[in-house]
């Protein structure tokens, strides 16, 4: 029935495409900047392949916001599935101190303003389990 996606056809198609790219791509980002909401930025530095993923993600965010984001602070204006798909990337960018352009920073702030985000962060902070050998970058 389309709920969760932008109502406008072009915005919905663009959001679905970005969601598919997020789902299937960005392997270097996923490998080198694993999600850990307890982590705080430090001197760790990733390689050029992760930099390319970071640049592509910020490009996607710029395109979506420029073409479809006039109706609100999220990628296609109002919060939608595409925003939820990129929320873990916001977490990674914050946890690793990734430099964000003004557009990416605005999107990250919009995500951080969500009650669900704050709840997610609190749950992550309360997590005590540490899996030796799988959690390469301990908080």
Region roles according to the model:
Residues 26-30, 57, 64-71:
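Short, structured loop/turn "capping" segments at alpha-beta junctions
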Residues 73-99, 103-105, 110-113, 118-121:
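GST superfamily/GST-like fold recognition
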Residues 47-65:
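Amphipathic alpha-helical packing segments from all-alpha helical-bundle domains
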Residues 4-14, 68-81:
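All-alpha amphipathic helical-bundle segments outside canonical DNA-binding/catalytic cores
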Residues 1-47:
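GST-like domain detector, emphasizing the conserved glutathione-binding G-site
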Residues 124-139:
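Acidic/histidine-enriched, glycine/proline-rich intrinsically disordered or flexible terminal extensions
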Residues 10, 24, 52, 79-85:
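Aromatic- and histidine-enriched alpha-helix N-cap/loop-to-helix transition segments
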């Amino acid at each position: 029935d389309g709920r969760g996606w932008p109502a406008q056809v072009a915005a919905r198609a663009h959001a679905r495409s970005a969601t598919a790219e997020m789902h299937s791509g960005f392997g270097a980002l996923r490998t080198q900047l694993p999600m850990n909401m307890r982590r705080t930025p430090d001197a760790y530095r990733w390689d050029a392949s992760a930099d390319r993923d970071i640049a592509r993600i910020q490009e996607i965010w710029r395109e979506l916001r420029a073409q479809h984001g006039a109706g609100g602070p999220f990628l296609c204006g109002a919060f939608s599935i595409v925003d939820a798909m990129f929320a873990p990337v916001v977490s990674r960018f914050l946890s690793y101190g990734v430099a964000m352009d003004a557009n990416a920073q605005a999107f990250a702030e919009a995500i951080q303003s969500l009650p669900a985000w704050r709840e997610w962060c609190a749950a992550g902070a309360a997590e005590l389990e540490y899996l030796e050998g799988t959690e390469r970058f301990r908080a």
